[in-house]
Every structure is written in C-alpha cells, then in structure tokens.
Regions:
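N-terminal strand-loop-strand
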Residues: 1-34
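Conserved beta-strand residues within beta-sheet cores
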Residues: 10-12, 62-65
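Intrinsically disordered, low-complexity segments enriched in glycine/proline and serine/threonine
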Residues: 15, 23, 43, 55, ...
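Acidic/polar N-terminal loop/beta-strand segments that form early-domain functional surfaces
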Residues: 26, 37, 71-73
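Nudix hydrolase/Nudix homology domain
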Residues: 30-32, 104-153
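Short, solvent-exposed loop/turn segments at secondary-structure junctions
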Residues: 31-32, 71-76
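Unchanged
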Residues: 39-64, 74-125
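Conserved active-site "lid/cap" helical segment
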Residues: 68
C-alpha cells in the first residue's frame, strides 16, 4: 500500500519597507518569489520564519514577526503537491545591504532584491496575490489571517 502524500506547510515572508517589497529573484527561470520555505517538523511558525530568514538573508538578519497576513492553498495534483502557505508580515533589521544578497544555498543564480510595491512585475509568484497585496499595503495591512484560498501560480 502506497503512503498517502503529506501536506507541506510553507512560510512566505512579506517584508515591506520604504515602499519596497523584499523578494528573491531566480535568474535561471526569470521570476520573483516571496522569501521563505518549508516549516520543519517540530518548529513553531515563528521559529521556522526566523530560520528561513537567516538561511536566505544571512545569520545576522533579525526578523520582527508582525502577523500572519494570508493563508493560501497550494495544490498541484499533477505533481502530487499539496501545501498550505502562510504569508507572514514582518520586518528585518537591514535594508540596502540586502539588495543582491546571494543565498549561499542557491549560489549566484538567485538573490534578494527590493521591488517597488506599487509597480510589481508580472513574474512575481503567486501572480494572483499581487493586486491584493498592493491594496492591503495601502491600508497598512490592517487585516490578518485572511484565507485567500487556492490561487494559481
């Protein structure tokens, strides 16, 4: 009997500062995505978020965890993927120093970059979240824990 696939919990950071959004750019695939990764077994959401920030932005980066903004279903049955994504609003203790920070895990093909939050590119994934994020930014992210359902890539 085949084991049932597991549901993965992913943490995605929404780091907005000075009208900019901190994301990762993948130069091989030419797209942007929110910084984050999988929640490990035995970790709290806060511990996982802090670990992911350090892994992707450096050991000296501190995360100021504000709140969970969005909860999203991530379903790709054709790839046996089923996940739950938590988009976390937070802040970090650095700004300009993070531009083009290379994540050692991914070499020189992926790096952190700040994007103008009012002019986000079409290749920021998930695309379906962009307009909502921009509207919520204008409202100072007043809501929290909002279920946004299943969104296409």
């Amino acid at each position: 009997m085949k084991d049932k696939p597991k549901i993965k919990t992913r943490l995605k950071m929404v780091i907005a500062k000075n009208g900019k959004l901190l994301v990762t750019y993948d130069s091989m695939e030419d797209y942007y995505y929110y910084i984050g990764g999988k929640l490990e077994y035995g970790e709290t959401v806060l511990e996982g978020a802090e670990r992911e920030i350090k892994e992707e932005l450096g050991e000296d980066i501190k995360l100021d965890f504000k709140k969970i903004l969005y909860i999203r279903d991530f379903l790709q049955p054709e790839k046996d993927e089923h996940g739950l994504e938590l988009f976390i609003l937070g802040d970090v203790n650095k700004f300009e120093e993070l531009e083009h920070y290379f994540d050692s895990e991914h070499g020189d093909k992926k790096w952190a970059t700040w994007l103008d939050i009012n002019n986000l590119p079409d290749n920021l994934f998930p695309k379906a979240l962009t307009k909502k994020l921009q509207e919520d930014f204008k409202r100072n992210f007043s809501k929290s824990g909002e279920y946004v359902g299943k969104m296409d890539r």
